[in-house]
């Protein structure tokens, strides 16, 4: 009977520590900035900056719907979707006789390199 209060105290302490860690987790940037425009130092020249979209977009995962799972060759329980930092609007420019696409606005959307 005297062991139950000891385990209860340890369990509550562990729960408090886990809750504290969980609250700190979303506030970290993990070394990756949000998706936004940044100047491209290679192609930019004074008076004519060239911008490109850079940064992180986070993926999401969710349980695979049963009807989708039935059509899979190798059924998977988890389905994931990746998003990339892509240009929402672009403007074509010429820098040193090289045609470039200057990004003017960015957002997180479908990764273009996955499309054919």
Swiss-Prot record:
Predominant cellular place of this UniProt entry's protein? secreted
Instruction: Kindly list the places in or outside the cell where this protein is found, as annotated in its UniProt entry.
Output: Secreted
Which GO terms of the cellular component aspect does the record hold? Answer: extracellular space; follicle-stimulating hormone complex
* Role summary: Shared alpha chain of heterodimeric glycoprotein hormones. These hormones bind specific receptors on target cells that in turn activate downstream signaling pathways. Involved in gametogenesis and steroidogenesis.
The protein's organism comes out as: Clarias gariepinus (North African catfish)
Glycosylation site list: 77, 102
Q: List the disulfide bonds.
A: 32-56, 35-85, 53-106, 57-108, 84-111
What family does the database annotate? Answer: Belongs to the glycoprotein hormones subunit alpha family.
Q: This protein is called what?
A: Glycoprotein hormones alpha chain
Keywords annotated in UniProt: Disulfide bond, Glycoprotein, Hormone, Secreted, Signal
């Amino acid at each position: 009977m005297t062991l139950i209060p000891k385990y209860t105290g340890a369990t509550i302490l562990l729960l408090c520590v886990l809750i504290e860690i969980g609250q700190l987790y979303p506030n970290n940037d993990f070394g990756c900035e949000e998706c936004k425009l940044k100047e491209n130092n290679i192609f930019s020249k004074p008076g004519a900056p060239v911008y490109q979209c850079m940064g992180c977009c986070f993926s999401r995962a969710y349980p695979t719907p049963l009807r989708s799972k039935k059509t899979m060759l190798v059924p998977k329980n988890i389905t994931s979707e990746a998003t990339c930092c892509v240009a929402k609007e672009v403007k074509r420019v010429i820098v040193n006789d090289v045609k470039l696409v200057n990004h003017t606005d960015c957002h997180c959307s479908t990764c273009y390199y996955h499309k054919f």
